[in-house]
Design a protein with these regions (language model features):
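Low-complexity, highly charged intrinsically disordered N-terminal segments
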Residues: 47-51, 55-68, 72-80
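Hard-cation-handling environments
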Residues: 191-398
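Generic structural signal for well-ordered alpha-helices
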Residues: 77, 111, 164, 281-284, ...
């Protein structure tokens, strides 16, 4: 048995003031792809040959430049064309929240182009992030599609391996099935879908119960993605039957799950405490019990924001007689990074931190001591899946 493996991951925030280009992607071709995806062992355990295709990962980013996407899509499809006569199936990891200029969803476009080449019957399985958008055409052209259960996505590697195992079993048993899709008229943000909180915890428990049915192979609830404008935005339900004769039964289960989620629509809420910036600052200053974590949700780089806001930093710098030790997460400023990269560890330097792109990213003058330089890594669970460049840790003097 031979299965082609490819991956395209981009989460497109249309508010980001830049286009995602080829240099923004981690690109891998060859056997290293399997290790980075965390799926090498499953193929060895099942005695199945994985044909490594192409991997492109920009993580959370912006609208993708069309030429960049065309290149990536071409590389993924080239691998399939080169091995089409020996393939028993295709496994793809597609995030689901990409948006390409002049095209729309890159994920959907890739699958449509692949189906033009291999036809409607070659088994294709997709693992994906639940924060992606679906359509009936996209889902039902797949034999299997499975999203992560957990948010944060601590089960990402587990889900990829599970999806591959489902594909292998499907190929071995020669069942002609396809995934079933239901659309929900519901749009949610990631902060409203934390899996340790209700109602997502109950939804996941219900899906686990549904999968105990021998007629059902896989069940997924897809939260959707709302940070770019597209007609397919919103929640979706996917159910995959174990056998062709259970296809209609899967339709019923999809309706049941759709109703279950819909009936909980008023339970969705923002997890955690939220406050306006001035109130949040005061809460942090007055907290004397334990470490206080304050996040600027409007500058969330894991959703494609720029990461260059200095607003909260300037709030703390304006506090007179500050009695607390404050650790700031990364602030993006490539010019200041280059300046600090030239000096030695423990050396001091005067810097202007801030990109001055707008009012929120105004620069501030700081006298700092360089402490450390290291990679900024991206982790899913315990698996390092990529890097986001390098960062420099400094101590503000005075």
């Amino acid at each position: 048995m031979k299965i082609y493996v490819g991956s395209f991951t981009t989460e497109s925030n249309e508010k980001a003031p830049y286009k995602t280009q080829i240099q923004n992607y981690d690109l891998i071709q060859g056997d290293e792809l399997l290790s980075v995806l965390g799926v090498k062992d499953i193929f060895e355990e099942e005695n199945v040959e994985a044909i490594s295709g192409y991997y492109a990962n920009a993580n959370a980013a912006s609208i993708v430049e069309e030429d960049t996407f065309r290149y990536i899509e071409k590389k993924i499809i080239e691998g399939i064309k080169n091995h089409i006569h020996e393939l028993d199936g295709i496994y793809l990891h597609l995030h689901g929240a990409s948006y390409v200029e002049n095209i729309g969803s890159g994920d959907h476009h890739i699958l449509k182009e692949i189906r033009k080449i291999v036809g409607p019957y070659l088994p294709i399985a997709v693992s994906c992030d639940p924060h992606g958008n679906l359509t009936k055409e996209y889902v039902e052209s797949l034999q299997i599609i499975r999203s992560y259960r957990e948010n944060p996505h601590i089960d990402a590697t587990e889900t990829k391996n599970h999806t591959i195992k489902l594909l292998i079993d499907l190929i071995r048993h020669h069942e002609k099935i396809h995934a079933v899709y239901r659309k929900l008229p519901l749009i949610l943000g990631g902060e409203q879908s934390v899996s340790a909180d209700e109602p997502v915890r109950s939804i996941n428990d219900y899906m686990n119960q549904l999968e105990e049915d021998e007629k059902i192979m896989s069940v997924s609830w897809h939260v959707g993605y709302l940070r770019h404008d597209c007609p397919e935005a919103g929640c979706g339900i996917v159910v995959v039957p174990t056998k062709e004769k259970y296809q209609k039964y899967a339709e019923k289960i999809a309706d049941d799950l759709k109703s279950y989620v819909w009936n909980k629509r008023y339970e969705f809420h923002y997890t955690g405490k939220t406050a306006e910036p001035e109130v949040a600052l005061q809460m942090a200053l007055e907290c004397d019990k334990k470490t206080f974590v304050l996040t600027d949700s409007g500058d969330n780089t894991t959703s494609g924001s720029t990461g260059w806001n200095t607003f909260v930093l300037r709030q703390f710098l304006a506090v007179k007689n500050l009695k607390k030790n404050i650790l700031f997460g990364s602030i993006k400023d490539e010019y200041t990074y280059k300046q600090l990269d030239k000096i030695n560890i423990n050396a001091s330097e005067m810097i202007y931190l801030g990109m001055n792109k707008d009012e929120l990213s105004k620069s501030v003058v700081l006298n700092v001591k360089k402490l450390k330089k290291a990679d900024i890594i991206l982790v899913h669970g315990e698996k390092v899946i990529g890097t986001l460049g390098q960062g420099i840790l400094v101590h503000v003097i005075g």
